[in-house]
Amino acid sequence: MAVPPPAGSEPVIARPGVGQPALRPATSGDVSRLAGLLADAFINDPVYTWLLPGSLRLQPRLRAMFAAEMEQYVLPNRGTVWTTFGCDGAVAELPPGAWEMPKSFTGKEAFRWVRAFGMRSPLAMRVQRAMEERHLREPHFYVRTIGVRTARQGRGVGSALMQPTLQRADSAGLPTYIEASSERSAALYERLGFVHMGVLELPEGGPPVWPMLRPPAGSTHRAADG
């Protein structure tokens, strides 16, 4: 997550393409608002609704989890969170070598994680471990989370949010890795050049998750079906 620019300097702005929203790197002051929009974006996500079945407090639980991820995982690991100027969507990326979640985040001191998942925290931690075991090992950029406010979905915001990460990966000649938790998100990632790497079966009969990889532009890199 970026530090605000010094007074008098121009902010960093990404303009993905004609007709697409301009983006900016989020600051620590955006965390609460971005956690709220991500909670809204993932309110019907198959993985989260399975992890927290029938929860009447699903949205505040998700908000707490996303805030914790940004402040305890993405930010300390040299990550960047891109958002639109209206905070309609957000994407959290991690650079090569920084994708592993700190042990302190899922260990005994992870109070905010426990607050978010409650009695389901042990299962949530098993899901995280399963994803880490399957994670791409070669150097890559990792898109940890991407979400668009429900009222703004289907308008190209998600595609625009992905552009800074994909451009950085292409410049570095490295692939980009992401996990799709729904067929709809997998279809979006396919349109952006990602290919499937098999299916990840979650513990205790959880819904499928699709690891996906996008080779750098001009590369002959092919994803293995895992």
State where each predicted segment sits.
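A short beta-loop-alpha structural element at the N-terminal edge
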Residues: A22-G36, D40
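Active-site rim helix/loop that mediates acceptor-substrate recognition in acyltransferases
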Residues: S55-G79
